[in-house]
Structures are given as structure tokens and as C-alpha cells.
Amino acid sequence: DSEFAELKIRGKIFQLPILKASIGEDVIDISRVSAEVNCFTYDPGFMSTASCKSTITYIDGDKGILRHRGYNIKDLAEKSDFLEVAYLLIYGELPSIEQYNNFTKQVAHHSLVNERLHYLFQTFCSSSHPMAIMLAAIGSLSAFYPDLLNFKEADYELTAIRMIAKIPTIAAMSYKYSIGQPFVYPDNSLDFTENFLHMMFATPCTKYKVNPIIKNALNKIFILHADHEQNASTSTVRIAGSSGANAFACISTGIASLWGPAHGGANEAVINMLKEIGSSENIPKYIAKAKDKSDPFRLMGFGHRVYKNYDPRASVLKETCKEVLKELGQLENNPLLQIAIELEAIALKDEYFIERKLYPNVDFYSGIIYKAMGIPSQMFTVLFAIARTVGWMAQWKEMHEDPGQKISRPR
């Protein structure tokens, strides 16, 4: 039986359908409110508004649950590789061995970018931020695939594969250009994560031997960042896509949104904060500063718009961080890790943080891992974009396959 919520306004009662969720909260359908009541709803930041139907990702922030297509994020991080999760997000099911092999071969086949793209890179000054370079490069792909500007249903999957394949190549090119080194071509004998590390750190005169611990850690980081419901950048991709814009342009808008310090740049802010704290002895002073509303200092890496419990991704990254630093001989003498662990322990026992449900989030440990790997801070958000492109493309594909989706037009 259908359920309804009642809205009473100006002496009249209107019935609003309640849509049943397969899991999580039900939703009140307000799509007819403006026509029937002559009023709009007001929800800054979309705090209580669902803009679409989706079966890709589920989050229960109160319980600290994150699932992709029904699979727990911790299980995926421990037992899958990134392209397996990419297949899951795009197609809805984990691949068979044959499907996985075919998918990875297609991604490898499309990893090379057009040589003319090199000329675009040369137009940037050497001090350009890698995100600025990547933003322009991804958007420029529209010019190289004019046949895909008007999409048919059969093109969605090929476009997703192309985007997933080319973004690590372009990301590594952005880094190489920013440090004045020659580009390194992808090596299709390597898997996705190995290939990215190869393109980042190899040079024409020096081969890069991939450390399996580093590869495994980066694989987990990519999985943990692959999708996260209708966040700012994903919503931006969907809004752009609702107009019929091509996928390359849509992903460019997602990258632009992700670049914002409140979204994708938080792990770099955590590193800067830990450096500012300087030593464990200073933690109480900075805890006090964080509580002081008149003090501009903020405790970065704590709290989340959705999670009111421990971010499940953060617990995986905490252990991954220890594994990486142990492998690199930094576990006992890495000052940033020591400060982070003690800061977390103190904050989790403090009533101020407990009452406000401020727990470590995914950004708290990821920057420490990147730094230990030798990845510079200006590349942190670039790596986030590599991972999140999988989610963006899955959401973009789902949006186009939804017959009820309309062009986005907030009032």
C-alpha cells in the first residue's frame, strides 16, 4: 500500500507520496509541490534532498557503514583490486574471471593518449598546479573523440573504459610536466596501479621497481576513494551530464569541484596541520585551540558531513599507513604518524569531540601514506581524481540509463 506524508499550508492539506528505499531512509516525493502548493522547498547545501535514484553506493553515517552495490567497503579493500571494484560500480556485479580479464585488457588498450596532447601541456608554465593541467587535459579529450559527443546507449561503457584508462596517464603526465621530467608511456604488461606508479616515478634512464606493499596500499586508497554517494563533485558531474554534455566535459566539472579545499584537498590540509602541531607535547594546546570558536585553527581530518561515527575508510587507512611505514623503515621514527596517532587517541576520549561526533575521516591518514610513498602534496587531489573517476563514470552512466532523470534546474 502507498504511504503519504501530509503537508498543511494556507489551510489546505496536500498528500506527498513516500517512496520506499531498498535500504536506509525512505524519501518524501516533493516533485509536485511547486505546482500544487505554489511554493518551493528551501534546502541550502541539499542537506535533506535526494536528487536522483541510485543503486551504486549506500552510506549509513550513524553506524559507519559504506557499501558499493551491497558489498562492504572493508571487504572490497581487503579482497579486491581497483579495476574489479570499477567493474562492480559500472556494471552492478563483481566480474567473473573472463569478464575481469576482458575488462582489464580493454583498460590497458585505451591507456595511451593522443600525441597531440603533449602540445597542450607545453602551453602551461612550469609552476602550474597538476590539477590545473589535468583539468584542461581531460576536457580537451572531447576534441579527440568528436564521434562520441552525441552518445548512444552502447557508447556509455566504452566511454567509461576510456576515461578510467586515460586519467592515470594524464595524471602522471601532469606531474612529470610540473617537475620538468619527460613523460613516461604506459606499460601494458603492468596492472593498473603498477602502471601508474611506473609512469610517476620511472625515467628514460631509470627503471622503477614497484614495491608490492606500496602497490597494495595505493590499490586500497583507490578503492576507498572510488565512490561516495552524491557528494559535491559527483553531483556536479550529474548536473553537467543532465544537460547532455559529453562525458569528458562532465568529468572536467567533477575535477574542478574536487579541487576545492573543502572536498578533495583535505588530506593536504591534514599534513599541514600535523606539521604545525610539530610534536606530541603540543597536542593539548591545539586541542584547546580547536575548541575555541574565536580561534581560526581547525582540527583537519576529523568529522564528516555524512558520518557521525568512525569513517570505515579511515580505519582501513590507519592500518595501511602502518604497513607502508613499516616497509619503508619509518614506523618508529615518522613524526607525523606519531602525532596523528596520539591526536586521534586524545580526541576520541575528549567529551567535546564525542558530543559532536567528530571522528577521524578518510583524509586523516591518506596524506601520511602519500608523503611516505614520495608523492608530493600537490598531487594528493590528483590521485583522488583518478580513483573517483570510476564513481563519476558509474554515476554518469546510471543517470543516462534512468528514464525519469531530467535536466537539473534548481530554483
UniProtKB/Swiss-Prot annotation:
Q: What else is known?
A: Citrate synthase is found in nearly all cells capable of oxidative metabolism.
Q: Which GO terms describe its molecular function?
A: citrate (Si)-synthase activity
Among InterPro entries, the record links this protein to:
Citrate_synth-like_lrg_a-sub, Citrate_synth-like_sm_a-sub, Citrate_synthase, Citrate_synthase_AS, Citrate_synthase_bac-typ, Citrate_synthase_sf, Citrate_synthase_typ-I
Membrane-traversing stretches: none
Record-stated family: Belongs to the citrate synthase family.
Q: Which pathway does it take part in?
A: Carbohydrate metabolism; tricarboxylic acid cycle; isocitrate from oxaloacetate: step 1/2
This one is known as Citrate synthase
Catalysed reactions listed for this entry: oxaloacetate + acetyl-CoA + H2O = citrate + CoA + H(+)
Q: Which domain of life is it from?
A: Bacteria
Q: What is its EC number?
A: 2.3.3.16
Sorted keywords for this record are: Transferase, Tricarboxylic acid cycle
Q: Gene name?
A: gltA
